[in-house]
């Protein structure tokens, strides 16, 4: 059981890493990535943890950073569709499948 990333989610993560790297340094960017990986592994193990949303999706917040992971449960694991900032564009990534 594992997770896969929508190409848009890959870009969301890259954008967040660029932002934190430029504004706060590599250490903070690495902490963001570590926190994302922690949440992704947690959701693979317990896909029911996220708050139910639309289109069969679930949302789960990162603990330290103002981002939420939007994902869908699959038989083989989870598909991460969006990594969305919690204070910007509440419908961001909504059209992704």
Task: Identify the function of each model-found stretch.
Residues 57-59, 68-69:
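Short hydrophobic/aromatic beta-strand element in the GNAT-like acyltransferase core
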Residues 63-65:
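A short, glycine/Asx- and small/polar-enriched loop/turn
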């Amino acid at each position: 059981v594992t997770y896969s990333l929508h190409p848009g989610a890959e870009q969301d993560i890259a954008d967040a890493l660029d932002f934190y790297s430029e504004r706060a340094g590599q250490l903070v960017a690495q902490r963001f990535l570590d926190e994302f990986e922690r949440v992704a592994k947690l959701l693979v193990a317990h896909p029911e943890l996220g708050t139910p949303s639309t289109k069969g999706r679930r949302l789960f917040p990162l603990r330290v950073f103002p981002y939420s992971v939007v994902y869908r449960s699959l038989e083989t694991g989870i598909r991460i569709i969006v990594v969305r900032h919690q204070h910007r564009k509440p419908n961001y990534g909504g059209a992704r499948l």
